[in-house]
Amino acid sequence: MDKFKGILFAALSAATFGLIPLYANQAILDGVFNETILVYRYGIAGIVYAIYLLFRRMNMRLTRREVKEVSLAGVGGYGITAFFLMWSYHYMPTGVATAIHFFYPVVVALLMAIFYKERLPLEVKAGIVLAICGVYLLSWTPGEVKWLGLFFVLMSTVTYGCYIAALNRSVLKRMNPDVLTCYVLLFTALFYLILAVAQGKMEIITRPRFLLDMV
């Protein structure tokens, strides 16, 4: 049953994540800075999630070590991944970029095998080969290949793979997943807020369409 739930949640996650480019692309076309998009996206998601958890009376307290680990996960993992993925949208079709991003399970499998000596079954090895072939086919176009876009999306794959692998082997694995997700979103939003303000790229946007897209 737990394995079935895991597969179901993974499928739902992939399906909803695949919708992100539909809304991010419109904001990019409207000339909104990447940093502003990420502040609104993760800020709104984090605040809504926090309200939901408080309504459920979840324990939101973190130890000092957990604060350090969560902030690193938010900035160094989730945050950097979002940065690379958003920039890839500027150089290649958003649907293709997001599809290539889902190559990250291969990165996770390889990291776990190399650094944690986990055994890769034959079917996993076959899946890795098929995934590599899929990335090649998605990246190939009849014209000029947008190498910079491919670089950005592959970097998003690597950083997110490292993020997932690190979660499996850190103190964060013992945290409630809902609380962990909430704080990762909030720390990511805070990181991009500081970055956007420092670079003069923070925009106060009240257009209903933009806010709806971010939600």
Feature roles, as predicted:
Residues 12, 40, 73, 100-103, ...:
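Hydrophobic core positions of alpha-helical segments in small-molecule transporters
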